[in-house]
Amino acid sequence: MTDIVALTLNPSIDISTSVERVEPTRKLRCSPPRFYPGGGGVNVARVALRFGAGVELIYPTGGSTGHLLRRLVEREGIPNLAVDLAQETREDLTVFEEATGAEYRFVLPGPRVSESEWRNCLDILEQLHSRPKFMVASGSLPPGVPPDFYARVAKIARKLGAKFVLDTSGAALEAALKEGVYLLKPNLRELNEFLGAEVADDGAIVAASRRIIARYGTEVVVTSLGENGAILVSADKTWRAEAPHVHVLSAVGAGDSFLGAMVSRLATGHSLEDAFRYAVAAGAAAVLTPGTALCDRADVERLLPQVRIRNLEVRELAAAVGH
């Protein structure tokens, strides 16, 4: 049974390596590279599978890198449908500097996707034999894809009776919100970009989330705050989660681990609070692993008791806004 259909339009081959020190001009001798299938929806599917959810991944691939991406997805054991592209799938590079512990991320532009290619992705969604509980769209839109693409996906999700979950930014975000989103998961930077204003404290984040809910009918807004945890707002809930303190090896994929864990718990019948707790633990667990290895289920279970969730009281919110 398919609980979750995950979609990404801009997948990648994620390559991670390390070097003693990053310096200009001279050759840098790197450690043996690790290769992972990457992109928002791909990573969400990888994590959801680790949490026992039935998942299907839909993604476009092209060229020799696209062939490698398919092999990497198959290696993860993810049921998938790949749409052929004329251009090459992109690659991303993460370099860990051993001397300082700094992480450098080089993100290459995605291939141009033609109208027939992105329409093929929509056709696959519309013709799904399964009726998923959730449809997750995550990641940026590559060149050639219109900003209302995720809005079209939202419409298909509604037709299939699936709850639509979105993690993206820019014009694609607002267009999709107007069509209808069940759960929105921005990070703080993405929330600020969407608002066109700087919000930082809990009260301002909650107020912004409530405005999104009131204006667009979104049911849940979860803002991930990295090492500072996360804030969840719905029509009747305002929760603040504190993240466990962990040693950061790589922050790549923490947000995708957060979302993958949350949706998989919801899709397998658990409560919103349980899903939120697992999401925060998964985000923390992801930074313990190298590159885009994402969270390990055993690490998530170990960190879970350290996640503290509390209701944000009206007085706290008023004080934060006043401050």
Listing of model-derived features with the role each one plays in the protein:
Residues 1-58, 67-68, 313-323:
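Glycine-rich phosphate/adenosyl-contacting loop at the front of the ribokinase-like
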Residues 6-7, 59, 82, 136-137, ...:
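General beta-strand structural signal in soluble alpha/beta enzymes
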Residues 22-32, 105, 236-247:
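Glycine/charged-rich beta-loop-alpha catalytic/anionic-binding loops adjacent to active sites
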Residues 46, 93-95, 229-232:
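Short beta-strand scaffold segments in enzyme catalytic cores
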Residues 48, 187, 255:
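Short, conserved phosphate/pyrophosphate- and ester-handling motifs at nucleotide-, phospho-/glycolipid
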Residues 50-133, 302-323:
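Conserved N-terminal subdomain of the carbohydrate kinase-like
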Residues 133-205:
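Conserved beta-alpha-beta core of the PfkB/ribokinase-like small-molecule kinase fold
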Residues 155-159, 174, 178, 202-323:
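Conserved phosphate-binding/catalytic region of the ribokinase-like
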